[in-house]
Every structure is written in C-alpha cells, then in structure tokens.
From Swiss-Prot:
It comes from Rickettsia rickettsii (strain Sheila Smith). Its main location: cytoplasm. This is Tyrosine--tRNA ligase. A motif ('HIGH' region) lies at residues 39-48. The gene is tyrS. Residues 345-411 form the S4 RNA-binding domain. InterPro entries: aa-tRNA-synth_Ic, Rossmann-like_a/b/a_fold, S4_RNA-bd_sf, SYY-like_C, Tyr-tRNA-ligase, Tyr-tRNA-ligase_bac-type, Tyr-tRNA-ligase_bac_1. Keywords: Aminoacyl-tRNA synthetase, ATP-binding, Cytoplasm, Ligase, Nucleotide-binding, Protein biosynthesis, RNA-binding. The lineage of its organism: Bacteria, Pseudomonadati, Pseudomonadota, Alphaproteobacteria, Rickettsiales. Belongs to the class-I aminoacyl-tRNA synthetase family. TyrS type 1 subfamily. Catalyzes the attachment of tyrosine to tRNA(Tyr) in a two-step reaction: tyrosine is first activated by ATP to form Tyr-AMP and then transferred to the acceptor end of tRNA(Tyr). It is an enzyme of class 6 (ligase).
Length: 411
C-alpha cells in the first residue's frame, strides 16, 4: 500500500491542496514533509498522537520527516482557535520543552542522518535573526490582509470581540515563512497539520509558489474528539502525556483500556499498527468480546509508546487490581513525608496531595459522592484522619478514586 493510500485508509485525511498530484509524486519519488509542534510543555500528549503516527508512516514509506519545534513562534503564540492570548515562554522554558518533545517523538520515529531519518529543527534558528524591515520589504507584499481577516481562526476572535494582538496576527506570516525556508533549504514539499491549520498552510504554499515557483503541497487531518465529544488528550485527571515522567505506562494503558466502546475501531486504525485482518475483527466484535478488544488495544498502544515490557507490566498490574483484588507494586506511587503521616492528615487532603483530585474541594466532593476508597474500604468521612495505622504490610496505603484510578502512597 502506498503512502497516500494508507494515509487515507487509516482515517488521517481531511483536505489537500492537490491530492491527485501529491499522490502521483509520492509514487514516483521520496519527499520531505514537515509537521510543527508547539513548545508549550515538556512532553507531547495523545492529542498529538495522530500527527506523530503520520510522521512514523512517512518514515516507513521511505519519506523524510521534518519536525519543527516552534521555539521562535512559541514566543508569540498561535491564535488558531484559541479563545485567549497565550502565555509567552522564556528561552529557558522553550529549550527544556524542546528536549522533552524530542523524547516523546523518539519513541515513534528514528532521528539521524540517513535519507529517511527524521530531523528536528527549531524555527528560532532562522526567525531569531530576522530583521523586521528586511522581512517587510522582502515578503510583506506577498500577504493579503483581506484574506487573513477571512480566516476562521481570526474571524472567530473578531466576532467575539476578543483581543487579537498584532503580535499574534504575525504568527501566520511566520508559519508561512517556515514552509518557505524549509522548501528552500531542505527541499521540503509537504506541510501536514490539523484542519485548524489549513489557512496557515495554504498561505505558506502560496508564498513559495509566488517567490520560487516550486510545487509544494499542504494536507490536513481531521480534528479528533472521543465519541462523547471530549477533546483527545485531556481527561478529568489531566493530560494523557507520552513521557513516563509525567504519566506512568500503567496510567497510559488504563486510558486506552477505558476508552468508550464506540471508539475502539477508530482508535485501532488511527493509533496502532494492527493488520487489516486484525482491524476487520475489531469491526465485527460481539458485545462479549469488547473488553478483550480494549485490553488488546491498550496493550499494543502502550507497547508502541513505552515498550513491550512496560505493556506487560501494565497488563499484569491491571489484572491483579481489577480481576484478583490484589495490590500491585507497579501502581503509580507518590511519596509522603513520614512526619506528615505520623502527625495525621485528613482524608480529603491526602487525596489532593496524592493527585487524585485537582483541588481540595474536588477531593471533598469525591468523598461525599462515595467515590473514594482507602485500602479498598469506602471513605465515609472527608475529615477522617489518616496516619501510620493505615499502612499495609508493604508500607503503603492504597488510594482509589472511582473504580479505575488507583495510587499507592509510600513513606
């Protein structure tokens, strides 16, 4: 199966500037294509997983993935579909975040000097040295303000009478220049991104055509939500991070294990590398087979992101907790100072400190709603004092929020 054919078959396709021509070119030759990522966190989360899998697919078909870390544009902020002005990051924050993002990506694609090896570039390398007057003189006449004002991302903010700074308005010019720069210096002929980036991508392709006459393309993916309408990558407990220092492999496994029934087939297509025969089996699942399919999906996606050993460990932990009622050492763990437990801490504060609630009021609400357990016993009193008497044989306290979120507290 060719790259574009598989791209469409997996459900990645939304829009392309010239699909027929791009299909023909990618059949004849290998291309370089890029996707940009913001530098706003020290890890990517599953909201970026489709883009990452596309980079992986590119590489598997012998094309060269280029990853752009927006070290330059992160200093401004992309207004695309954002309701508010974005916080501007320091150079130190951007450098730290870029390192974490490369760690996320390295789980899925190979970086190096080979023909199809991925490269990662920071657009600060060329944007930081910009002379503003030179930029206006050399490129300003190629951009139409009339057209920019019609873009949905800008129009939405204007219609809501929300602040749109000139700083942010320049973002689309800089992203267009990124594409031009990569086309000129790295022979990049394709920019990929979410459907919300369509306007920015087309501006870049137009800029290249006007200046150099090169044939380049833009292709976008659909914006994804779960079947219930929730945004991919976010849960009530926070983001589903790819790096294990922010989210344990067990919690990553549990996210996929607990996906909605209606999402199983779609997630298997988008995020796994199951064969077509295996996908066909997913599509014809009987009701009694759904849980087994979810376990298989969670296992494969955890193996892909972390390792086979991490997936096995997560599966074994889940079996011990949910099927055998045991405590497993591989559960996520937080450490509490011994002095705190000796003095005693209220139940609601313990759930908050352990990260099972985002606020103390949320922890109280959890307990009042009969959703909290300590050592598998329901917590009836939010002010109940938890001390060293609650430590089990392994010197841990097991906290549970609902049926599916568990954590061990150690001293």
């Amino acid at each position: 199966m060719r790259f574009i054919e598989e791209f469409i078959n997996k459900g990645y396709f939304h829009q392309c500037t010239d699909l027929d021509r791009l299909t023909a070119i990618t059949k004849e030759t290998k291309i370089a294509a890029y996707i940009g990522f913001d530098c706003t966190a020290t890890s990517l989360h599953i909201g970026s997983l489709m883009q990452i899998m596309i980079l992986r697919l590119l590489q598997q078909h012998g094309h060269k993935p280029i990853v752009i870390i927006g070290g330059g544009t992160s200093k401004i902020g992309d207004p695309t579909w954002k309701d508010e002005v974005r916080k501007i990051l320091s150079k130190e924050d951007i450098a730290k975040n870029a390192e974490g993002i490369k760690k996320s990506l390295s789980k899925f694609i190979k970086f190096g000097d080979g023909k199809s090896d991925a490269i990662m570039l920071d657009n600060a390398e060329w944007l930081d040295s910009f002379n503003y007057l030179d930029f206006l003189r050399d490129f300003g006449s190629y951009f139409s303000v009339n057209r920019m004002l019609t873009m949905d991302s800008v129009k939405l903010r204007l219609e809501r009478e929300q602040h749109l700074s000139f700083l942010e308005f320049n973002y689309m010019l800089l992203q267009a220049y990124d594409f031009y720069y990569l086309s000129k210096h790295y022979n990049c002929s394709l920019q990929l991104g979410g459907s919300d980036q369509w306007g920015n991508i087309v501006m870049g392709a137009d800029l290249i055509r006007k200046i150099s006459g090169k044939e380049v393309f833009g292709m976008t993916t659909p914006l994804l939500t779960t079947s219930s309408g929730a945004k991919m990558g976010k849960t009530a407990a926070g983001a589903v991070w790819l790096n294990e220092d922010l989210l344990s492999p067990y919690d990553y496994y549990q996210y996929w294990r607990n996906c909605e029934d209606a999402d199983i087939v779609r997630f298997a297509k988008l995020y796994s590398e199951f064969t077509q025969e295996e996908l066909n089996r997913f599509e014809s699942l009987a009701a009694e087979d759904i849980n087994a399919a979810k376990k298989q999906l969670a296992y494969e996606l955890t193996k892909l992101c972390h390792s086979e050993q991490a997936a096995k460990s997560a599966l074994e932990t889940a079996v011990k907790i949910f099927e055998e009622g045991q405590i497993d050492e591989n559960l996520p763990t937080v450490v509490l100072e011994q002095e705190v437990l000796q003095a005693g801490i209220s139940a609601y504060e313990l759930f908050y400190e352990a990260g099972l609630a985002t606020s103390k009021s949320e922890a109280r609400k959890l307990i009042r709603g009969n959703g909290a357990k300590i050592n598998d016993r329901l917590v009836a009193d939010e002010n109940m004092i938890i001390n060293t008497n609650f430590l089990l044989d392994k010197k841990v306290i097991k906290l549970s929020a609902g049926k599916k979120r568990h954590i061990l507290v150690r001293v």
